[in-house]
Amino acid sequence: MRISDHQHPIDTGVSSKPEATEVVSGLDLSGKTALVTGGYSGIGIETVKALTSVGAHVVVPSRDIDRAVQALDGVIPADQIGAMDLSDLPSVTAFGETFARAYRVLDIAIFNAGVMACPLDRTQQGLEWQLGVNHVGHFALLRTLLP
């Protein structure tokens, strides 16, 4: 198989370096429920702001509730922030089960949380930290949320 070595721009109506609000411009997500991991810092908080700006009900799991509540003050209510630590699978399962009971439908899942270039460490279950948090934790969350 040959892969083209020349890229051609496509007209999406979105600039090459869009703001989060530009990406959701024109959308109406009223009545939709979104889950954003890592939603209390960096790209995650901008994602939460963009989704709420077009009507979505956004839930943010966090391993540091106080930090998340402070960061998201004025963006989403504190009761839409739940305790979850992606490095601890029972915590992930507990959050997923609580979410599933509280919200019968999940319309949007954005798995944004992650760690990078961290020193060698292990999760509660003995997995390498980066693999456990970035991949296995999110996979476990998805499995818990699926019917």
Residue map of PLM features:
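Non-catalytic terminal and boundary segments that flank Rossmann-like NAD(P)-dependent oxidoreductase
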Residues: M1-L35, E97
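N-terminal Rossmann-fold NAD(P) dinucleotide-binding loop
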Residues: G44-I45
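Conserved glycine-rich Rossmann-like NAD(P)H-binding loop of the short-chain dehydrogenase/reductase
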Residues: V54-Q70
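The beta1-alpha1 cofactor-binding region of Rossmann-like NAD(H)/NADP(H)-dependent oxidoreductases
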Residues: I65, I81-E97
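Short alpha-helical oligomerization interface
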Residues: A117-V133
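Amphipathic alpha-helical dimer-interface segment in Rossmann-like NAD(P)H-dependent oxidoreductases
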Residues: V133-P147
